[in-house]
Amino acid sequence: MSIVRMTDLDLSGKRVLIRQDLNVPIDNGQITSEQRITASVPTIKLALEKGAAVMVTSHLGRPKEGSWTEEDSLAPVATRLAALLGVDVPLVRDWVDGVKVAPGQVVLLENCRMNVGEGKDDQTLARKYAALCDVFVMDAFGTAHRAQASTHGVIRFAPVAAGGPLLMAELDALAKALDNPAKPLLAIVAGSKVSTKLELLSNLVDKVDQLIVGGGIANTFIAAAGHHVGKSLNEPDLIPTANQIVADAKTRGAEIPLPTDVVVAKQFLPDAEASVKALDAVDADDLILDIGPQTAQRYAELIASAGTVVWNGPVGVFEFESFSHGTETLARAIASSKAFSIAGGGDTLAAVDKYDIAKDVTYISTGGGAFLEFLEGKTLPAVAALQARGQ
């Protein structure tokens, strides 16, 4: 990958601007999950250890450009960052036209989405960002799919543009999973709708050996195979598409295994009575809310024999205890597997947390939309810009 890495650069005495993803949930001025802040600390520490004058910026929420509001301020983040780094981290409010910072110091530059032109990747703004630094470091994989002034434009104009450790770890893990995977490569793609993950399914079916589908997506594939799905969430208009994906898989010698048993209920409620049924016994008023134990065991065996596992989405309504067992079985199979495993997507990360398997998954992507777009085979604007500068 032709990207200059921050870890390879001499940063002594250099002004370094780092774009991090510090977009954390804040409730009444209190940070409710600091995972992204914690993740950014090693990169900032490394820049300080290398003798740089460090400027860090990030977006937070969706503020109106050109206006400052307290709820969109990075002030709580600056406080927490200072505690984690053990150094002062002043917050600089008006920073576009110049920042005072000395080698060995770090400042946090206020929410970059407050700057006029940030969202539209304005060239004038991007050039101003670039003028602040000797080296620009893109370390926010979660925003790498957005072409904005702080994630794309600045890369074109900075004297040197590099990928930070977090971004490079993410790209390295994804490349290992998709470009050069240990075989067999198994992907789990689940979600409510085929339509939202159509590009993902179409791209993965060209790469994988097995593709496990779950949730509402699986219901559409079940219906496409000629089975009744009752009142379950599915997309009848996408049955031809599902059939095409199955045909494409067959042509490649890949497999899309379907459930043989499912867990159903009459109502979509946490305390609805759950029944395990064979796939061909689903009634007209049934809702399929999870895979059955027999299917979960079969999928777990496929995971156990995989060389690489890519996991995006829980296979049932895992928030409801009665319909969580399929997702739990697969999560535990991934945790105990020797395969290279990568998990990503909001609901997937919630399942990883629920079953406490983070330490047993090789790589957990915090990229969200960027992770999905990478899996879809799309070029991420920030990555493309870094590659162009690395030539």
UniProtKB/Swiss-Prot annotation:
Please provide, alphabetically and separated by semicolons, the GO molecular function terms listed in this UniProt record: ADP binding; ATP binding; phosphoglycerate kinase activity
> Keywords assigned by UniProt?
ATP-binding, Cytoplasm, Glycolysis, Kinase, Nucleotide-binding, Transferase
Please provide one cellular component term from the Gene Ontology annotations of this protein. Answer: cytosol
Specify which residues bind substrate according to the UniProt entry for this protein: D21, L22, N23, R36, H59, L60, G61, R62, R113, R146
Q: What is its EC number?
A: 2.7.2.3
Q: Which Pfam families match?
A: PGK
Which pathway does the protein contribute to? Carbohydrate degradation; glycolysis; pyruvate from D-glyceraldehyde 3-phosphate: step 2/5
Catalysed reactions, semicolon-separated: (2R)-3-phosphoglycerate + ATP = (2R)-3-phospho-glyceroyl phosphate + ADP
Compartment list: Cytoplasm
Q: Where ATP is bound, by residue?
A: K197, E319, G345, G346, D347, T348
Q: What class of enzyme is it?
A: transferase
Segments crossing the lipid bilayer: none
Which Gene Ontology biological process is one annotated for this entry? gluconeogenesis
* HAMAP family documented for this protein: Phosphoglyc_kinase
Query: How does this chain assemble?
Result: Monomer.
Protein family according to the UniProt entry: Belongs to the phosphoglycerate kinase family.
Name of the molecule in the record: Phosphoglycerate kinase
Native source species:
Xanthomonas oryzae pv. oryzae (strain PXO99A)
